[in-house]
Amino acid sequence: RTPGAVDRLRAALDRWDMRGFTTYLTEEEDGDWLTGDDAAPFFALAEQRGLIASLSLMPHHLDACATLARRHPGLTILLHHHCHFGPRSATTRQDRPLAHAIASCGNVFVKLSGQGNVAGADEEYPYPDLDWLRAMMVELFPGRVVWGSDFPVSSRHTTYRQSMNAVLRHTPLTSAGREAAMGGTMARLLGLSQG
């Protein structure tokens, strides 16, 4: 997120067979970088090349991300950790309107990952206090939720199996929804064949 980002991305694309990239906005940032002049050519190139923009954002960044998603409808955006809703960001189910603008963008997907990162400090797997959050993500992003292990970082909070079971057992998905979340959707986004 420094000047010359588009040139660095172009050089990386010339060197490697990239499928996407990740960037992390800090809690202190307002999200303006996502829609600023420096980022515009960067995201335009990412859209042109079919990359997945994997973004770690906080709930207060979602309006800017919605603007980005509408400006670049061919850009797949993958948001980390349930959009960081939950006790860590001091958001509750009453903050649901923060997600509405981004949920209406069909090119935005959400990783059902990092529940230990968004949960309260005294909460433990299976994080029953986050039931509202899992339900909200499935409802607002139908067919656009994917599992992510967040491994090895998640090992501070859960085992690898627990990170899977958070989706398989504790997220209100249909059988087809679980299959999609556990690999089918990502395979489609990456252009991989299934089977």
Language-model segments: residues:
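Active-site groove signature of glycoside hydrolases
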Residues: 16-28
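Flexible loop residues that form catalytic
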Residues: 26, 82, 115, 150, ...
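Short, acidic/polar
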Residues: 2-13, 94-95
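Short, well-ordered alpha-helical microsegments
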Residues: 5-6, 61-66, 164
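Catalytic pocket-lining loop regions of alpha/beta-barrel enzymes
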Residues: 19, 33-146
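Mid-to-C-terminal alpha-helical segments outside catalytic/metal-binding sites
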Residues: 136-146, 155-195
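Conserved, mostly hydrophobic/aromatic
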Residues: 21, 46, 110, 150, ...
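Active-site mouth loops of central-metabolism enzymes
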Residues: 1-3, 27-33
